[in-house]
Amino acid sequence: LLAQTASPSLQPLFADIALQSERDKLRQHLRDRTLGETLALPLNPENEYRYQSACWAISQFMPADPRIETLLRRCLQHYRLLETETRRAFLEALYTVHPAGFESGLLALLEAEAHPKLFAMICLYLQRSDPANRSALLARMRSRWPQADAHPILSSLQSFLHAADQKEKAPPPDVGDIFRYQHSFGIKTVYSFQRWDRDQPGLAAVQGSDGRFVRDSAGRLLLFRQLARSGSNLPYFITNGNTPQGIFSIQGIGQSTNRFIGPTPNLQLTMPFEDGWKGYFQMPADTSEPKASYAYLLPEGWRAYAPAWEAYAAGQAGRTEIIAHGTTIDPSFFWGQPFHPISPTLGCLCAPEDWDPQTGLLRDSEQLRLTEAFRKAPGPSKGYFIVLNLDDSRRPIERADLETLIEAYERGQ
């Protein structure tokens, strides 16, 4: 997901991976080599890297193939002999495509798993399959790690399990307060409004440094479709999990070298704690007191709202390289999913794009419109990017949801 900061090309955008011939090759490679050839080999130290790669591919592309269960059960059988990264890839793939059926095997591994992140991933699988497991899982965690409160991942796991049946019901504080607060700083801001159910796509809006939201020449609010769901759908504090809520820092506009992200200009974001807080704050701040400095970015009425701190907790847990980008991935991988045709990611925010499969040229792009709106909005080339869940409705965020919020704010200006 590393991206190179650069000015976008003025030439038509082209992605060879979007050609139908390349998409067909990728599908064949996943079918014949990633799964077929890997399963023909024993899972031993010599071939372990192939199983790890297969698990990563399962998490990203979510292919429908009955052989996947065979591969995952083989990984479970050999789990104690696997390297840490292969264990993580297996648990991520399992969480992605098999929400049930592996409970007894994972429960047997839980007591011996000494890696906090892997322990957390096992707990999350068991809690999702049966929410009644929550109390027992918390008790095991506290018994194993009495100082869990001091560990970034385990403390987030504890909060997540405690709030699993409550957070969706709690509405956020007044969103207008966020709009007014950002205006008071005179800092350009992108807001990505999401649902708690990240299967549902959200919408992004751009507020200039003058406090006004970007509109078209007819005065219509500009909104941009965006998915904040990772392939795994793991929580925000796990690597490759869903995009955390909270405040990211926009460092500018760049272009990626990743073929699946594609060449469309993206918004370069940094998180709390990423790269030693370098460049995160858009104003003078004391990074020796990061909690107080982050809190200052929130209106007073939002500082006790736990979801607004997800980005802080995720950064503290080691998450990095979350950006807002487009996609060249064949949307047919996700046919039938609520978020089709947008691609889930490794935790970034993804806008839909349409590439001509015959020429590889970009035909339509929400991502391009978003970056252009940010570029043209009043203010410098940097700013903040704020991700907020509005509620737990099982439907995408729609224009009417945001027009009500934004117009109420603008009437009060």
What are these regions (language model features)?
Residues T320, H340-E353:
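Active-site nucleophilic cysteine motif
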Residues A6-M62, R67-L72, R80-R88, E92-P99, ...:
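Cell wall/extracellular polymer interaction/catalysis modules
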Residues L1-T5:
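Bacterial Sec-dependent N-terminal signal peptides
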Residues G105-L109:
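A short acidic, amphipathic alpha-helical/loop segment
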